[in-house]
A protein has these predicted regions:
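Short S/T/G/P-rich N-terminal loop/turn motif that feeds into the first structured element of a domain
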Residues: 1-50, 54-70, 77-95
Protein backbone atom coordinates (compact mmCIF):
# COMPACT_ATOMS: atom_id res chain seq x y z
CA UNK A 1 0.00 0.00 0.00
CA UNK A 2 1.22 3.54 -0.75
CA UNK A 3 2.62 5.64 2.06
CA UNK A 4 2.34 9.44 2.44
CA UNK A 5 4.28 11.94 4.56
CA UNK A 6 3.05 15.48 5.14
CA UNK A 7 5.15 18.24 6.70
CA UNK A 8 3.83 21.67 7.67
CA UNK A 9 6.12 24.71 7.51
CA UNK A 10 5.98 28.36 8.64
CA UNK A 11 8.19 31.37 8.05
CA UNK A 12 8.25 34.99 9.22
CA UNK A 13 8.53 36.28 5.65
CA UNK A 14 6.19 35.89 2.69
CA UNK A 15 7.66 33.28 0.33
CA UNK A 16 8.80 34.88 -2.91
CA UNK A 17 8.43 33.40 -6.38
CA UNK A 18 12.21 32.90 -6.30
CA UNK A 19 11.86 30.81 -3.13
CA UNK A 20 9.14 28.72 -4.73
CA UNK A 21 11.25 28.21 -7.87
CA UNK A 22 14.22 27.16 -5.73
CA UNK A 23 12.04 24.63 -3.93
CA UNK A 24 10.78 23.29 -7.26
CA UNK A 25 14.20 23.09 -8.89
CA UNK A 26 16.28 21.99 -5.90
CA UNK A 27 14.31 20.47 -3.06
CA UNK A 28 11.71 18.41 -4.92
CA UNK A 29 14.45 16.52 -6.82
CA UNK A 30 16.28 15.94 -3.51
CA UNK A 31 13.17 14.42 -1.94
CA UNK A 32 12.58 12.23 -4.99
CA UNK A 33 16.20 11.10 -4.95
CA UNK A 34 15.68 10.03 -1.32
CA UNK A 35 12.95 7.62 -2.43
CA UNK A 36 9.69 9.53 -2.93
CA UNK A 37 7.73 8.70 -6.08
CA UNK A 38 6.03 12.13 -6.15
CA UNK A 39 6.14 15.38 -4.18
CA UNK A 40 3.77 18.33 -3.97
CA UNK A 41 4.51 21.60 -2.23
CA UNK A 42 1.31 23.43 -1.31
CA UNK A 43 1.17 27.09 -0.32
CA UNK A 44 -1.39 27.12 2.51
CA UNK A 45 -1.01 30.82 3.36
CA UNK A 46 1.32 33.75 2.74
CA UNK A 47 3.75 32.42 5.33
CA UNK A 48 2.81 28.75 5.54
CA UNK A 49 3.17 25.72 3.32
CA UNK A 50 3.10 21.95 3.38
CA UNK A 51 5.02 19.25 1.58
CA UNK A 52 3.26 16.03 0.60
CA UNK A 53 5.58 13.17 -0.31
CA UNK A 54 4.35 9.90 -1.83
CA UNK A 55 6.20 6.60 -1.40
CA UNK A 56 5.60 3.13 -2.85
CA UNK A 57 5.27 1.72 0.67
CA UNK A 58 6.18 2.16 4.31
CA UNK A 59 9.53 0.39 3.87
CA UNK A 60 10.61 2.87 1.20
CA UNK A 61 9.47 5.81 3.33
CA UNK A 62 11.28 4.47 6.40
CA UNK A 63 14.49 3.97 4.43
CA UNK A 64 14.32 7.59 3.23
CA UNK A 65 13.87 9.21 6.65
CA UNK A 66 17.53 9.91 7.47
CA UNK A 67 17.97 11.70 4.13
CA UNK A 68 14.63 13.49 4.53
CA UNK A 69 15.76 14.78 7.94
CA UNK A 70 18.87 16.25 6.29
CA UNK A 71 16.77 17.85 3.53
CA UNK A 72 14.38 19.34 6.09
CA UNK A 73 17.32 20.78 8.02
CA UNK A 74 18.72 22.32 4.86
CA UNK A 75 15.33 23.78 3.90
CA UNK A 76 14.97 25.27 7.40
CA UNK A 77 18.34 26.94 7.04
CA UNK A 78 18.06 28.09 3.42
CA UNK A 79 14.56 29.55 3.75
CA UNK A 80 14.59 30.43 7.46
CA UNK A 81 11.54 28.22 7.84
CA UNK A 82 10.33 26.28 10.86
CA UNK A 83 9.01 22.73 10.64
CA UNK A 84 5.69 23.01 12.49
CA UNK A 85 4.61 19.37 12.30
CA UNK A 86 5.05 16.18 10.32
CA UNK A 87 2.66 13.29 9.83
CA UNK A 88 2.84 10.00 7.96
CA UNK A 89 0.73 6.96 7.20
CA UNK A 90 -0.40 4.33 4.76
CA UNK A 91 -3.03 5.32 2.22
CA UNK A 92 -6.29 3.69 3.29
CA UNK A 93 -8.44 4.87 0.36
CA UNK A 94 -7.73 6.60 -2.93
CA UNK A 95 -9.60 7.78 -5.99
Amino acid sequence: MSFITVSHWATDEVMSEEDINTAQDRFIPMIISAGASAVQMVRTGEKTSMVISHYAGSETAEAAQAKIAQIRGQASSDFEMKLVSAHAGEVSASG
